[in-house]
């Protein structure tokens, strides 16, 4: 993993400049200080069972040896994820957006989700996030519901993808 450290930290810098908290929680500085330990903690999330968290598998997208995005597959849903987040969440490094990275990450993550035992996966996004809507719909998702979560926030969309035995719709 050390050979991806620099490109990962560059991508992290782009997310920080956008002000995105991203998926790290309090690990932002840890990724810079001890990259190997950070990666080990993310790998351990697949077995994590602490209050408020569900086990998750984290995958990185690489293009030409560069970190271009990440996708997380949550092995199950808790109450919070049923409202916002779903089974899969992804981010594309800002300088790589608009190139199909997120669509491909989701496409490749679906067989992994199936291998983890998921038969159907939930993806949520804001009604104003047209890029994410395209990514989700290109991967065969069906919109089952929309909800107002808060008067000051966009409508939330709830998409489901049924996974075949091969892991892809």
Predicted stretch roles:
Residues 1-87, 94, 112, 152-169:
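GNAT-family acyltransferases
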Residues 7, 105, 131:
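Charged catalytic carboxylate motif
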Residues 89-92, 98-115, 134-138:
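Conserved acetyl-CoA-binding loop-helix of GNAT-fold acetyltransferases
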Residues 113-124:
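Conserved GNAT acetyl-CoA-binding A-motif
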Residues 123-133:
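Conserved beta-strand-loop-alpha-helix junction that forms the acyl-donor binding cleft
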Residues 124-125, 140-158:
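Conserved catalytic-core motifs of GNAT/GCN5-like acyltransferases
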């Amino acid at each position: 993993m050390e050979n991806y450290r620099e490109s990962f930290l560059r991508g992290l810098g782009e997310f920080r400049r956008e002000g995105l908290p991203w998926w790290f929680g309090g690990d932002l500085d840890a990724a810079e200080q001890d990259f190997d330990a950070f990666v080990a903690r993310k790998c351990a999330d697949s077995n994590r069972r602490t209050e408020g968290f569900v086990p998750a598998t984290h995958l990185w997208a690489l293009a030409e040896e560069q970190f271009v995005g990440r996708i997380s597959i949550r092995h199950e849903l808790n109450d919070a994820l049923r409202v916002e987040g779903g089974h899969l969440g992804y981010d594309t490094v800002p300088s790589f957006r608009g190139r199909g990275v997120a669509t491909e990450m989701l496409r490749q993550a679906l067989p992994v989700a199936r291998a983890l035992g998921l038969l159907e996966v939930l993806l949520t996004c804001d009604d104003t996030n047209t890029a994410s809507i395209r990514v989700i719909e290109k991967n065969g998702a069906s919109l089952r519901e929309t909800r107002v979560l808060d008067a000051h926030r966009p409508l939330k969309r709830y998409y489901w993808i049924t996974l075949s035995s091969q892991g892809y719709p």
